[in-house]
Amino acid sequence: MIRCPDRPRMSADVGRYGYPIVWPDEVGETGAVGDLGKPPPVSRRFGDAVLFARSMHAGQARKGTQIPYISHLLAVTALAIEDAATDDLLRDQTEAIAIAAMLHDVVEDTRATVVDVAGRFGDEVARIVAACSDTTGSMPGEEKPPWSCRKQAYIDHLAEADQATLCVSLADKRHNARCIVEDAAAALLAGGDFWSRFNAGPDQQAWYYDELARVFSVRRPGPAADELCGTVARLRELATLTRHQ
């Protein structure tokens, strides 16, 4: 079904590809025909967040690729929305979680600050974004702490984090782990160098994701954490194969 809100009724009630159009006055109180309940709202603020992320991350690409960085932000946002919207405790926070997921790297990887995010999207979004970063305590231009120190501090932080932060962070780590596994497997088959694109080698990456999977399994158990555990098991195998290559 195609829904067309805020448009006047027209004589043609069939969409471009032959699907029937459902007008707002024909949709029941549940917000959709035959669904299980009204979905959590996602307002124009989310669209503003997409535009802001696109602007701030313009010209950035995923490590070692020519894939626009916003692809990662969109993937993480989709995973976070699905997780939040199916969680009774987080459903009412779905929009804030979606916006925070879209902006989860904006403070760490662009010139934007937590104050900027709060001014545009509110304190709750800014709080989640700050909590998902491992470098928000650094001053502009200040050198980051060593990789292992940052990652251990982040793992310790997740052990105490709230569920909204865990939802966004888990979505981020799920997508990152998937991409690492896919690219590492392809590089292993092709005999190419993959791990050099990171600040830490395969063994350190395997340790980090093992620890993340352990924390998420305890703090946010469920299908999303289970998926991460499975992906991390494969990542660990690839790290071992790389070491013996």
Predicted features by range, described:
Residues 3-4, 11-245:
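Active-site helical microenvironments for divalent-metal-assisted chemistry
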